[in-house]
Regions:
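Polybasic low-complexity intrinsically disordered regions
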Residues: 1-88, 93, 103
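Helix-centered, glycine/charged polyanion-binding patches within enzymatic domains
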Residues: 93-165
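Structured core elements
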Residues: 21, 46-48, 57, 90, ...
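A short, flexible helix-boundary coil/loop motif
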Residues: 153, 157, 184-191
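Generic, well-ordered alpha-helical scaffold segments in large soluble proteins
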Residues: 50, 74-81, 107, 146-149, ...
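Active-site lining segments that contact anionic ligands and/or coordinate catalytic metals
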Residues: 17, 42-44, 86, 109, ...
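Hydrophobic alpha-helical scaffolding
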Residues: 34, 61-64, 136, 140, ...
């Protein structure tokens, strides 16, 4: 009711607790800037992938966080689950934050492949053209393909359960199914 009153009587479409779905009130508006889908509805999901296309961590966020604040937490989760610091961390430009990159370097990560699209600094431009940096970005591009597979093969494009717990369960089942396929593929090669 508050949202309706603000829109109709107050002529204010910018309501902080905007409800976009009556059936799933926790649904959020997600703007990614894609030409084909400028606005999507749902929840933000962070996925971390290691070698052999195995997903090591995922998180379904209740409220969409700022991507640039997630890098250190992602590396900490990796260290906690796998017991070692990664040699290379790759993410898209939304994760760029000088303070986060510095903190990740202090943790012992050798190579951080997170592009800074807005920089004019020639040193940073040169780093972004190095072989290891480009390799990290190719890895990240492959991870985008993993997200597409999760959506198509395992139904992550639409959650069939209700509520935040249902969303966590649905995403978790999809990731478990995908990991089982990839683990089986790796074991078949080594058998």
């Amino acid at each position: 009711m508050k949202q309706t009153k603000a829109r109709v009587f107050g002529n204010d479409p910018h309501f902080t607790e905007k409800i976009v779905s009556i059936f799933e009130p926790q649904t959020e508006v997600i703007r990614k800037g894609k030409a084909s889908k400028p606005t999507e509805f749902g929840k933000m999901v962070k996925i971390q992938e290691a070698e052999n296309q195995i997903i090591t961590s995922y998180e379904v966020y209740e409220k969409k966080p700022n991507d640039s604040d997630l890098l250190v937490k992602a590396v900490e989760e990796h260290c906690e689950r796998l017991g070692q610091i990664p040699d290379l961390v790759a993410a898209d430009a939304a994760f760029h934050s000088p303070s986060q990159k510095a903190a990740v370097q202090e943790m012992g990560v050798k190579h951080i492949s997170v592009p800074n699209r807005s920089t004019k600094n020639p040193v940073i431009r040169r780093i972004q053209k190095t072989r290891w940096f480009r390799k990290g970005q190719k890895w990240r591009t492959g991870c985008e393909g993993r997200i597409s597979v999760l959506k198509r093969r395992h139904g992550l494009d639409r959650c069939r359960y209700r509520g935040q717990d249902g969303m966590n369960r649905w995403v978790g089942f999809g990731i478990i199914a995908d990991n089982l396929i990839n683990i089986g593929r790796v074991l078949a090669v080594h058998a």
